[in-house]
């Protein structure tokens, strides 16, 4: 042990296409752990996973956070993964990973095997939260409101008879425009919006480059709202925020470019709708067994006052433009206290 204070292993990077976002999130968390009261309570240790899946020591990992990697020899800083489960200096793992191998239950299973607590959902909640098809199936079983959708596998694209049935379902229950998404990616990676059958086919082929499983959703003309959830045995929800963007839809570029999107926190909603969204956010998390932290995304049609759950993100971002920490700050919980709360929840 480095001291009597709990050592927090901040894990980031990874093989996912959201690698760079993960680094930004980790820097926010690491800085929050090194700030004022948290510095007196915890010892923060960064653990970087490179794009090839290699784990690296604390010195090299910290250099990645502060962009000093050119001064170090890359190969000499790798950590033997077989020894990772016996890293006695880590008391609590804090994953800042996004996408496959980070928030899909894979690394959660590894953490569980170490016998050390970790921030966020367990294997089941993470896996269900990552796979949009599995998540929506659970929502359906709990009668939670969501937009119409159909799903298919990459192998189905070459099956003309099967694709004919998909086209029929699109025309019958979804219509155009519609969204085509890889089932297991976040940050709008691999997503297209199709206005015709031709664009739909192109979108399917594009999504198939990222995932074997593909989901097609009805496009809803409405407001995009988000709500944070915090807790395990007792869950609470944040104020509701709204995302506005200059692009046709909430693309990867608009998510991480402050000039292309903006947020309104709290969202301009009547109290009844706001309360309903906060309640649904917790219900959605409980349905898929997500806990610790989560951001739940919604669509809201003002004309019908209909609320649709879009998805649960079990490891939301902590970048400068990320909604989750901003929602909680607007709810009276500043970043440093939020991070400390997440660690204490992990130890429950």
Curated annotation (Swiss-Prot):
Binds 2 magnesium or manganese ions per subunit. It catalyses: 2 D-alanine + ATP = D-alanyl-D-alanine + ADP + phosphate + H(+). Its cofactor is Mg(2+); Mn(2+). GO terms for molecular function: ATP binding; D-alanine-D-alanine ligase activity; metal ion binding. SUPFAM superfamilies: Glutathione synthetase ATP-binding domain-like, PreATP-grasp domain. Pathway: Cell wall biogenesis; peptidoglycan biosynthesis. GO terms for cellular component: cytosol. It is found in: Cytoplasm. The keyword Nucleotide-binding applies. Mg(2+) 2 binds at residues 311, 313. ATP binds at residues 171-226. Mg(2+) 1 binds at residues 297, 311. Residues 136-344 form the ATP-grasp domain. Keywords: ATP-binding, Cell shape, Cell wall biogenesis/degradation, Cytoplasm, Ligase, Magnesium, Manganese, Metal-binding, Nucleotide-binding, Peptidoglycan synthesis. It is an enzyme of class 6 (ligase). The keyword Protein biosynthesis does not apply. Its EC number is 6.3.2.4. One of its GO terms (biological process) is cell wall organization. Cell wall formation. Belongs to the D-alanine--D-alanine ligase family. This is D-alanine--D-alanine ligase. It comes from Prochlorococcus marinus (strain NATL1A). The lineage of its organism: Bacteria, Bacillati, Cyanobacteriota, Cyanophyceae, Synechococcales.
